[in-house]
A protein has these predicted regions:
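Active-site clefts of carbohydrate-active enzymes
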Residues: 644-674
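Short carbohydrate-recognition loop motifs
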Residues: 71-93
Length: 813
């Protein structure tokens, strides 16, 4: 039921509508006189706003954002005859507020908004439900009020805002809501129609918005237009790949097959996915002994869906004189995909060439990635899968070269098959270099592996319930992995990472002491890298603090220190702590450092505290040994000055940096990870790399056999993949991500540089060979020019890497 007069909403109201006269809409144009409502039956105990009453223009915004164009429209009304039309452009932060009479939301459990996106782009809005005077904090790190984010594809949708759980700081606002604040931080630009903003009581049946036959026809036409565009793009991409396949002598009436490097994303459901894929006469992989290197084979149906698709190396590869390269060293497994639900709160970068003839003529530009299905967890336990007609399915082909393998070229075939379809054979060549990479990363790494679940950023009620239950569920990822504890230790070492906890405290649930069994296991294998004894914090002045130091901290540290010393691994140890603290904390950090150095000599102190001078400036932490700035804050000149004074300067990433710098988010190109710990770490002389978490697992279930997983992408504050570089398969088996694979590849690239530097030193003379070698280890500008200007073209990285391999092999001969 609707009313044209103004009512004050109370907890006992039912079916009361607040019209535009009760809603001050920011920058709304004066609407023409409108007719009475059409009598459509709507869902909701209270319809608050349905835009049916004319109102003078009022300007109001609680946010420092650009205001969109707004007006009352006679299109896409789901209640009555009118809706609110809102239009905004690309990239500019925008926001608008709808005022309502002060309302008690505590008796309702949902708010619904009918939405039609009639623009050219899918887009999203965040809604902040607020009392008058509430401050809007649009940070992704905190929620000072009731907030939710909603994505609108082209066409119609209804946004449901769950009202049951409110942040504690916003509880007082819950009973006196007066403003609905909509905003977009990084919009794509579109036109949306909002209508029938209503409240629903607990248990009340939700009914989606209904539109007139004319509007339904418009909506259907919009959706079909988008579907037709996508279908045309997909058909064009398929036709181009089919033509390319024919040109290399590969033909199939049912199956399209191409290749991509391991450093690229092939988005499985993107209409243009196959445009990223190349038909090949054959595939080649080059690697050193002890190294891993991968490539992707992408399969798509020509028309109808394919069943039981697989890629296999069916026979050993053959080298000179019949020397075999075992097929068991070549894993061909299904790529898994993770769905990002919303537009990320950050931009990622891509390389644009300014001159195609000059490979050093490039720059970087940031863009905000679309939500959707991204390659992420590699399903090492899955060898075959079905492929739907609109999917481009990647298979990860990982080559592991045994350390005893003879150098040379090995040739064989990969077979691509599907049920009822003739197999396609791809010539496959593996070239083994005449040298070996170390078992340990040449670039020291410190990475936290401390599996945890969590509730995530603004979870829905269902997500909240599942994640709470997962805490006590023995089959949930944060628990079941423990069944395979030592398998995880070896798995991480295979990726050149030492099993460790950076945030170890005496009260830690997992590993309050270093896991001595794991560390000695790795030490015996020659794969033990740097590890953390315990977390060190600040120390305040005064007897109370010193008493705690003597009675609690020293005994805890002493036990761990003495154990590491007795096992003969103290030389690998450090104390990590004072994570990202600011200069105001420096006096207490210095006090703590003095105490630790005196009591536990020989163990370096490691911190990400924000000392921009790295221990050699005014108000610096002169008694700290290892500094670790964020890559985006790394200052080369200051780092070199600190190194000259005996400090080590590592670097790290977390949620930042974003835009044009490399990072480890799901949407970042995989090559970002490889470049960051490989070429970039060489170029900027980083002494090591730190990462705060490998195992932030919010998913309540392990990963199954479907490529389209329900593994949670937004692992930390809406940052996709942040702190989550691994996945958990059936029964707790470890699974890598594409990012982790590229991370290892980058560390192996770094090893190539170290090996070549050693060859330069041994060469001992100035000639064409040494000049060419020094150019390679200095990192050519075709790869890296600045932190925010590096090349993401895989061919450039391969060219550099292969040239280094040639130089190393020529030095050996």
């Amino acid at each position: 039921m609707k009313h044209s007069s103004y009512f004050v909403l109370t907890a006992v109201c039912a079916s009361v509508a607040f019209m535009a006269s009760a809603a001050a809409i920011a920058d709304m144009e004066n609407p023409a006189v409108v007719a009475n409502t059409t009598g459509v039956e709507v869902s909701g105990s209270c319809t608050m706003v349905d835009f049916e009453t004319p109102e003078d223009k009022k300007s109001y915004s609680a946010m420092p954002f650009r205001r969109p164009k707004m007006r009352i429209s006679d299109k896409f009304a789901s209640s009555g005859r009118h809706s609110l039309e809102v239009s905004w452009d690309r990239a500019h932060r925008m926001g608008f507020t709808i005022r309502i009479p002060e309302t008690d939301f505590s008796v309702y459990d949902r708010l619904a908004v009918d939405v039609v996106n009639a623009g050219e782009n899918a887009d999203q809005l965040t809604l902040h439900i607020a009392a008058k005077g509430d401050k809007l904090d649009d940070s992704v790190y905190s929620a000072n009020g009731k907030r939710s984010t909603h994505y609108a594809p082209i066409g119609k949708s209804t946004w449901l805002v769950e009202l049951e759980r409110w942040p504690k700081k916003a509880e007082k606002s819950r009973s006196k809501v007066s403003e609905l604040r909509f905003y977009a931080l990084h919009p794509y630009g579109t036109t949306m129609y909002l209508d029938n903003i209503r409240l629903l009581r607990k248990g009340e049946t939700f009914v989606a918005g209904r539109y007139s036959p004319e509007d339904e026809a418009r909506i259907s036409a919009m959706v079909k237009s988008e579907e037709d565009r996508d279908a045309a793009t997909r058909a064009e991409s398929k036709a181009a790949l089919a033509k390319s396949m024919a040109s290399v002598g590969m033909k199939s009436d049912a199956m399209l097959v191409g290749a991509a490097t391991a450093m690229e994303h092939v988005l499985p459901k993107a209409p243009d996915a196959l445009s990223k894929v190349k038909a090949v006469r054959g595939l080649k992989v080059r690697l050193a002994r002890g190294e891993y290197e991968s490539v992707q084979i992408v399969v798509a149906p020509t028309k109808d869906a394919l069943k039981r698709v697989s890629v296999k190396c069916v026979e050993d590869l053959s080298g000179q004189g019949g020397m075999p390269f075992a097929a068991s060293n070549i894993a061909c497994v299904v790529m898994g995909y993770t769905r990002t639900q919303y537009q990320a709160p950050y931009a990622v970068g891509r390389t644009l060439y300014t001159n195609s003839a000059d490979r050093a003529g490039y720059w970087r530009r940031g863009y905000f990635p679309r939500p959707g299905w991204y390659p992420d967890v590699i399903l090492d336990h899955v060898r075959e899968t079905d492929v739907a007609e609109d999917v481009a399915q990647s298979f990860w082909v990982r080559v592991a070269c045994p350390r005893g393998q003879e150098a040379g070229v090995y040739r064989g075939e990969l077979s691509v098959s599907a049920e009822g379809v003739a197999s396609l054979r791809i010539p496959f060549e593996v070239r083994v270099n005449g040298f070996e990479v170390p078992k340990l990363s040449t670039l020291p790494v410190a990475m936290n592996f401390n599996p945890k679940g969590g509730l995530g950023w603004l979870p829905t009620n269902a997500e909240y319930a599942e994640r709470m239950a997962a805490k006590k569920d023995p089959s949930a990822p944060p628990n079941i992995w423990k069944k395979r504890h030592m398998q995880w230790v070896d798995f991480l070492a295979d990726y050149l990472i030492t099993y460790d906890s950076l945030y170890r405290l005496s009260r830690s649930e997992l590993d309050p002491e270093p896991n001595w069994e794991a560390l000695m296991h790795l030490n015996k294998q020659g794969r033990l890298g740097p590890f953390n004894l315990a977390y060190w914090g600040t120390r305040k002045p005064g007897e109370k603090s010193m008493k705690q130091w003597r009675e609690k901290t020293v005994p805890y540290y002493r036990k761990i220190y003495d154990k590491a010393k007795s096992l003969g691994i103290l030389d690998k140890a450090f104390f990590y702590g004072n994570d990202e603290l600011n200069p105001k904390d420096f006096p207490n950090i210095r006090r703590s450092a003095d105490l630790i150095h005196k009591e536990f000599p020989g163990v370096p102190l490691f911190t990400t505290a924000r000392d921009v001078d790295f221990g050699v400036g005014t108000n610096s932490l002169e008694n700290v040994d290892i500094f670790c700035p964020l890559t985006g804050r790394y200052n080369y000149e200051r780092a070199e000055k600190a190194r000259a004074a005996g400090r080590k300067i590592w670097w790290y990433v977390c949620d930042g940096p974003t835009w044009n710098c490399a990072n480890l988010h799901i949407e970042n190109k995989p090559i970002d990870a490889r470049s960051m710990v490989g070429a970039q770490s060489v170029f900027f002389k980083a002494d090591g790399f730190l990462y705060w978490q490998l195992s932030k697992w919010l998913s309540p279930r392990t990963i199954g056999s479907s490529p389209f997983t329900d593994w949670v992408a937004a692992s930390c504050f809406g940052f996709n993949g942040e702190g989550c570089m691994t996945g958990v398969g059936p029964d707790g088996i470890p699974l890598p991500t594409v990012r982790l694979e590229n991370f290892r590849d980058g560390l192996e690239d770094y090893s190539y540089v170290k090996i070549l530097k050693d060859k330069i030193a041994a060469h001992g003379k100035e000639d064409d060979w040494s000049r060419r070698a020094r150019r390679l280890v200095a990192i050519p500008p075709s790869l890296v020019k600045a932190l925010d200007c590096f090349n993401d073209d895989p061919s450039e990285l391969y060219s550099w890497r292969n040239e280094m391999a040639d130089m190393i092999e020529s030095a050996i001969r």
